[in-house]
């Protein structure tokens, strides 16, 4: 048992509970700063995220705020794409020999993208008006939805980051859904995606189970504490601060 890792999990969990900002964008760069190899950081974070998102799925299932058809179309694209990204890194010698460097630089670019997406989401929540994409039925957007899954799934498979934030921004813009449905659908799809990617990483030996367990010991109470305190704080300033921190982390890794 590592007290420092548990405390880090508590810190990240509390921030997630307070702001709703994805834990992977905060946790993965922190693990790398602590000296964890990027490939292990990514694999461990995927497993950790799978377990934490399971609780979210159970809650939204009870609330009936999951659009299962949308989850299906996103997963059709994202899970094979994430598997492809992981396979490329581990099965092709040219990539496997340089995977730590590839993952580190990819993390930098994706963290920057995630930070921008969080800021854009703050803007869209206030300013976005109904557009022609939102007015289309889901069946008419099936190919586009699967394509979004392919693109963002590859990113998640490579870096563990974006299973929530990147897909959420796409759902806000493309689908006319209540905020609770966006969150529930996003978490349900993210659970399937990170679980599949986590299992595949585990098969390649890229998961530190003790590290994941210590993180969970801290993050679960952290999320509960953050969620309890969140009504006392305005979420937008906190989310903007977190986006700024993620942006700086990303730029340092590029």
From Swiss-Prot:
The keyword Glycosyltransferase does not apply. It is found in: Cell membrane. Keywords: Cell membrane, Membrane, Transmembrane, Transmembrane helix, Transport. It is a multi-pass membrane protein. The chain crosses the membrane at residues 5-25, 75-95, 105-125, 143-163, 187-207, 209-229. It comes from the Bacteria. PANTHER family: MEMBRANE TRANSPORTER PROTEIN MJ0441-RELATED, MEMBRANE TRANSPORTER PROTEIN YJNA-RELATED. Belongs to the 4-toluene sulfonate uptake permease (TSUP) (TC 2.A.102) family. This is Probable membrane transporter protein YjnA. It comes from Bacillus subtilis (strain 168).
